[in-house]
Amino acid sequence: MRSFQAIAITLVVLLAAGCNSNDSASADADRAQGGAGSSSQGDLPRGSEPVKLDPADFTTRIDNPYWPMAPGAEWVYREAGPEGTEQRVEVTVTNRTEQIANGIEAMVVHDVVSEDGQPVEVTDDWYAQDKAGNVWYLGEDTAEYENGKVTTRSGSFETGVDGAQAGVIMPADPQDGMAYRQEYYKGEAEDEAEVLSTDEQVEVPFGYFKGALMIKDLVPLEPKVSEYKLYAQGVGPVLTVKTSGGSGREELVSYSRAG
């Protein structure tokens, strides 16, 4: 269990550093929304700043080592909530593409969250990769379900529509301290991220990984909420730990490569 202890120790240290008051969470959000950041972050967008993207610079062939998305690839996760609930999350890279309003052709990734065999949330996420290798998040079409019926589509957005801006879901070359936005649709989707480490150890039901990438996700719309996500090269997301605003753990159970 050496890997579990390593990740647990890392998270304990991070929590100890940030549990003093809401000031820490506020500082994180301020930093992600435009404070001084690492010089290595290049031109990655932050906060609500507009960004102009040339469709000619993008492809649906996503081969970023920290999150390769070849059509047919599938990840299955087990998510344990704070009240003992357990959900199954299936993420599948489809063969479909979506023409985004800003002109970029995006890969469609289908995400289904279910509980007791019934869907509770179904989402189509839209991604594309630029020439540098950054994977951009261009929007989503999401629906939440209750008793088989859609209850809300809150959180859906499309880059180029109603002021929505693209964000980066995975940098080409993640470096410690790098900060950037993942999505921006005012009042609906404003997630930010910060790279914490590129040399973690992690163990999940699917396997044990060294050299994992750890990213902290921040939600300015919900200042008390933060998550730590770990990515393994050649696989993608393997573990998400929610450490404030409640608790929870989502771990990779199986992964099938395309073909």
Q: What are the roles of these predicted feature ranges?
A:
Residues 20-259:
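Conserved functional acidic sites
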Residues 1-8:
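Bacterial N-terminal signal peptides that target proteins for export
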Residues 9-13:
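Hydrophobic alpha-helical targeting segments used for export or membrane insertion
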Residues 15-18:
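C-terminal motif of bacterial Sec signal peptides marking the signal peptidase cleavage site
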